[in-house]
Amino acid sequence: MRIVIITGLSGSGKSTAVRALEDEGFFCLDNLPVSLVTTFIELVEHSREDIKDVALVMDIRSRDFIKGYDQVFQAMASAGHSVKIFYFDATDEVLIRRFSETRRRHPALEGASVPEGIRFERDQLAGLRRIATAIIDTSEMNVHRLKELVIGLVKGGEGVLEMQVNLQSFGFRYGLPLESDLVMDVRFLPNPYFVATLRPFSGLDQGVREYVMGHKETVVFLEHFRNMLELLLPSYRREGKSYLSVSIGCTGGRHRSVAIAEELYNYFRQRNVNIKITHRDIDKGLG
């Protein structure tokens, strides 16, 4: 029997995932106590119904879940069942907004605020997150994308949405991009701003790019940073992340960060990475 465990944070999209699996013919059950899981699986096995695919929503609402899930999962695997654990996640900001929109209280901690409930739930589920088959970050997903991703995962990877990388340059003077997953500070690189003939131009112009790339420290840095991203991107994909925001910052967001972002964009685009580029602050400070 194929068993999919749907778990993770409250408000992260588990109900949507269950509906997607129901549409694929899975027998779905929500909030089954851990103590009854083994009995339930045995009943399904001996049922007259031809049930081959089961999805169980198991999370912190069942108070014995945290202490008992490991033993139950091992028992299912030992019985010869194919067990996959899909852990659904989202950023605190997104979860807080979703709870605010639905006017729901957080179910994990009675009497606590939503942020307190989220922190408590993250802490309680940390061990489960580490053993998950896939970690699905729904922060940037709509319902359609989430359903498509879940269906792709149960089909062994077919149809899984390709992760989109959003590369952007910015100026620290104007604040960090709040949506950033990764931030790289390139203010240590030689600054074209202090070259009078280059100051009016941007990192999109050849002269500025040649100046930035013409220094050994830039070449060495770029090689190491590219290698790091090439290591990280597959790991983020395996976690089920559909969107990765990489921000490159310099002082004003016009010269160094733009030049470096363009170099990275061209490099990864040639390697068929689904990547987009924006320059948030390139036109600021001109007047």
Swiss-Prot record:
Which positions in this protein are listed as binding ATP?
G8, L9, S10, G11, S12, G13, K14, S15
State the UniProt keywords alphabetically: ATP-binding, GTP-binding, Nucleotide-binding
Signal peptide location: none
Pfam families registered for this protein in UniProt: PapZ_C (PF22740), RapZ-like_N (PF03668)
Residues recorded as binding GTP, renumbered to this chain, are D59, I60, R61, S62
The residue ranges crossing the membrane are: none
Q: Does the keyword GTP-binding apply?
A: yes
Recorded GO molecular functions are:
ATP binding; GTP binding
Matches recorded under HAMAP family: RapZ_like
Function according to Swiss-Prot or TrEMBL: Displays ATPase and GTPase activities.
Q: Which family does it belong to?
A: Belongs to the RapZ-like family.
**UniProt-recorded name of the protein:** Nucleotide-binding protein GM21_3387
Q: Which organism is it from?
A: Geobacter sp. (strain M21)
What taxonomic classification does the UniProt entry list for its organism? Bacteria, Pseudomonadati, Thermodesulfobacteriota, Desulfuromonadia, Geobacterales
